[in-house]
Every structure is written in C-alpha cells, then in structure tokens.
Amino acid sequence: MKAKYLLYLLITPAVLLFSSCTDFFEQDSDHVQYTDDYKLTEPGDTIYALTGIMNKLQALGDRTILLGELRGDLVSVTSNASADLRGIANFDITDDNAFNSPKDYYAVINNCNLYIARCDTAVKNNRREYLFKKEYAAVKAYRAWTYLQLALNYGKVPFVTTPITTEEQANAQYETKDLQGICQYFINDLSPLVDVERPGLGVIGSVDSRLLYFPISWLLGDLNLWAGNYKQAALDYYHFIATANGANTYFPVGAQYVAFYSANWNSFEIASMFNNESYSDSRKVVTMIAGDSIPSQGNYSQLRNYFNTSEANNYKVSITPSEGLIALSRSQKYCYMDASLGAKASPIIAPSDLPENKSGDLRLMFTWSTGNGYVNGKHYSRQSINKYNSRNIHIYTRTMVYLRLAEALNRAGYPRFAFQILARGVNNDVLKEYVLPYCHTAADSAFVGQFSFPSTANTGYIVRDITSNRSYNTMGIHSIGSGWTEYNPYYQFPTDSLVSDTLSYQIEKVEDLIMNENALECCFQGTRFYDLMRVALRRNDPSYLAKRVYARQGSANVATEKATIRKDLTNPNNWYLSFKGKIGL
C-alpha cells in the first residue's frame, strides 16, 4: 500500500483515555487498512506521508495564534467577534467552541506516530547515506511541537507515542503527562537528532518547504526553557543561530527598524520591517504553517479577516490592539541620534505627546493603521495589521529566537548578556566589553565563552556604530522601534545599591524588559499568553499573569475586565482548556 493513502487516514479513529473512540478522533468509513508489517521504504511513500502530516498541521494554524494572543493582554475582541473568539478572550471556552478540538492535535500526533513506527531509517542510498533520516527527524519535531501545544493549552494530556490502529488499542487506557513530563520526554527524544538537516522537498505549491519545518535546536530551546533548564535552553537557541544557514554561518538580528528621519518627528525611514516569506540567509520567517489558498479547501486561514477590514468580513474586524498594548508602546522613550554628526551626536528624546501613535516605540504605529474607508458610498472604519497579509501562519521569526535566547540567558544568571541583546546587539567585541568583565568565576567565563558571534569589517555580526559608515546587520532589538537604544539614558541596565541580592534583582528587572520587548516586537503573533504564563510559573506568582490580563483594557478598567472574564486568573487551573472532562486539569 502506498503511503499516499495515509492522507485519507486519521489513522483508525480512537480515543486515548477513559472515553469512547469518538472523543478525540473522528470516525472515517473511508479509511484504508494496512498490514502491521508495512514499512515506508520508498522515497515517494515518505514524501506523501510527510506532506500528509503538514496537511493535518494546517488545522492547528489559526488556533495557535488565537489561543496564544486572545488570552493575553495585547489585544481586545470587538463587538463583531464571534462567540468562539469572545469565549477565548474571556476564558470561557466551552466544549463546542470551534477552537477547542483536541482531536485535531491527535490527528497530527497519530499520523506522526505511524510515520515514526513505519519509517525504515536503516535504508541507505548508493552513497551509504541514510535515506529517510531527515524526514524522520522532521516528523519527530512535528510531534514534539504538537504535544507542547497540547500541554500549554490543556495542562495535562493523554500521552501516546505508538500508532493506534485497532479498536483494542483505542479502548486501552494510556498515561497522561503534564507540561514538565512532555518537555522531559521530548528533550530526550529530540536531542540525538539536533544536527540532522531538514528535508529538501523544494517548493510545495508556492511555498518554499524549508519554511515548513520546526528546527530541532530551536524546539529543544523551547522545551528546556519551559522545563527550567536555562543554560541548556540558551545553548540550544545559540545552536540554532549558529547553524541556521549551515555549519559555522551567521544569522544576525538584521538591520531592520522603523525610525524618525529627523528630530522634526514628522517623517520616517523604514528598513526591512516586513516578514516576507522568501527563503534567504537573512530570512525573517523561520517556520510557518501553510494555509490553503481558497476558503473551500477547508484549512483556509481566517486570521487576515479577524485582524483586517475587508469585503470578506463586511469591513468589520474582530481583533484590535488593546489599551494595554497602546499604553506600553506609548510609554517607551524614543531616542534619536543625528548619525551625520558621528561621535558628536547626542541623544534627543522624542516628545511624549505626538499624535497617531508616534510617541514611544514606533513598531505599533508601523504595524497597525486605521482610518476612514468608503465602499459603495458607505463609510467604514478601516483597520490593517500588516503582520497578517498572507494566507500562511508564521510561528517562528528571527527576532523571536533572539528574545528567547535573552530570556534563557537572563534566567541562567547572565542578565548583562541578555540586556545587550535588547540594547546594543551582540558580537564578540560586545561580549568582551560588556559581559565577560562581570563573569566573576571561571565557570561563568567558560559558559559565556561557548557563545561566539564573530565579526570582521564586512562579515559576521557587525554591530552598528554611529562613528562608522559601514553597513551593519546587528542591533539591539529594542532599537527596532525605539531609536538608538545604546545611547538612551532611559534604557539602562538595572542597578540598585540598596538591594542585597543584586543578581536576583537584576534578573527580575531584565526579565521585565524582555517581556515588554516580547510585547512590542511579537504582538499579534500568538505568543503573548504563553510568555506571561512562563514567567508567572517560574516566579510562582500567578498574579503576574492575572494583573496584566485584567488590565488589557487600561488600568482604569480593571474591575470591568474582571467582571467580563469572570474567572479568577490567580488560580492557574483557570488558564487551561478542558474538553468533555477527558482532557485538561
């Protein structure tokens, strides 16, 4: 039997724990049976099966963004939002909510389990290279990422790593794992595969397939970050950066920004700000889930219609930036430097009362635009979120990995290293001047020494320098929207001579800066709720998440938002979804 038939198979429908076989898997009378000894041994078989798994991932695209963003503090739902979207935002996600469907996750997982069980990884080509190792590793990464999403959203989930193909297997009872159990299992599962290259399937439709995989080193970083293995997480993220374009290559933050052209505050220059989907050594998008091109195909992403006015949504959006995000953006201090003056330039802080979101960080102004529109002689309020102008769903982006590297380094005990990622950008010269002098033990110096960001006059990680006209590709992430952060007197490494535990104080304050930067840089991208959750869990302080979500409509409207949500978010059990009492806490 050819593996292409597996595309019709959500492999014999089954539930995993304590319930009938219809709870997590749909019955499908057209499924194809296969023999227990069937193996994937032909290239065509493995390609069909791999693209079949990609197809199943499409069902998870929109909800990955929505569950991660609507429950955070950076967006609000409008009166035009559906009951399902409103339910997510209000933490009132019922069993019949369209985005509460564990079976879609298990459809991916069971297809992955089948592939892993049946793929013959011993087959070699005439060059004695293992023929299917790349596909095998990619499928293991798909499975790990999907289980991580399940655990983040449901808390405790049925855990199965073998394909369910019979009624007897369907009716068996299986163990459950929580987030920590999921992380530990897949850290062990993926670590041996960290240096396996991604498959080379070329272009699928109009999409470069190299953007459709989850890099194992990055995924290991996420798993270790959630597990609290901060040094290893930092090394994993660095491993991704150092090998993103092949061994011993470079993957810098890039020279991307939106900035005031002058201190007149009325014109801008914009460089490389769009997350286009082309594949290059300087690509912005690292991983995405491909969406269908037309609605009738079944996995057509609606995100563009949720965030942008269009004919398809009758010019009415469902999601808009929250007052909390607007206030955070406005509260930043934009630092202008006249680069034409070189070393003679001095910092000028932009006024705090500029109109049209021009005060503070400029990324929100660039990303979110509103205005008046007219169609057929009728007025409507126009909104555009330019992060959603594609049918594909962006999961990992380049700046995101640097922010997670900063988060891991900070919690590993290296807040100065983390701070430089935000403020200046890092290369070996920056590490030598601003990080290594504060490593007071040989062990700390040795750890930092494992990170190398080399540069020459025109290659490697070239940090911008106001005294030089040379091209650069590395800058502090805060500078993407807030000007010359490295010269900003309001953006300094936190110190307090009155604090006895200086390192703990610095780590918490730098973590606050990182979380603010996550909001400014990654807003609308589906990561915010999980960022808040991660910090709240590691600080053992559920109120860290709760007070921010309750304040998303502004500090003056906290009581109103609490009444709308009607869930005590200081109780972590209320952060998670459940489904028919069969999954969840």
Give the label of every model feature segment.
Residues 246-432, 443-447, 511, 522, ...:
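Elongated scaffold/linker segments in the mid-to-C-terminal portions of large proteins
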Residues 179-182, 196-204, 248-276, 348, ...:
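Surface-exposed intrinsically disordered loops and tails
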Residues 21-70, 544, 552-585:
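Membrane-proximal, proline-rich intrinsically disordered regions
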